[in-house]
Amino acid sequence: MPLPCIPPPPVSRDTAACIAWLGLAHASCVDTLRFIKHHDLKITPEAEYILASLREWLYFAFLTERQRCKQKGRGAITSGRTWFCFFKYEDARKSVVYDAARQTVSLQIGTIQQVPTTAL
């Protein structure tokens, strides 16, 4: 998987720890994109769109929360935004895969959903 597995954000509503987690997630996403471009790996447009969108989302959340960290009562908001970004990061991490044989980064093909059957 191109995106590394990082620990979840803190459970407590510690603003500084949440901001640090957002910075870590953003840096991981940027490093992954940089690694892909540096090693001339092929990346599908869909996978590139997901990674670039995640990078922008994490950057926006990181800057917004860092600017507002001195405001009182932002702990719950910062924690909520951080957990939202964590779930987005995990979704992107699970959907973007690296094929070593072809040296490509692409989206994972989902499993075929079985048609529900009813008992007569």
Curated annotation (Swiss-Prot):
Entry keyword set: Early protein, Host-virus interaction, Inhibition of host mitotic exit by virus, Modulation of host cell cycle by virus
Alphabetical GO biological process terms: symbiont-mediated perturbation of host exit from mitosis
Organism the protein comes from: Human adenovirus A serotype 12
Record's protein name: Probable early E4 13 kDa protein
Top-rank taxon, per record: Viruses
Database matches in InterPro entries: M_adenovirusE4
Family matches, as Pfam families: Adeno_E4
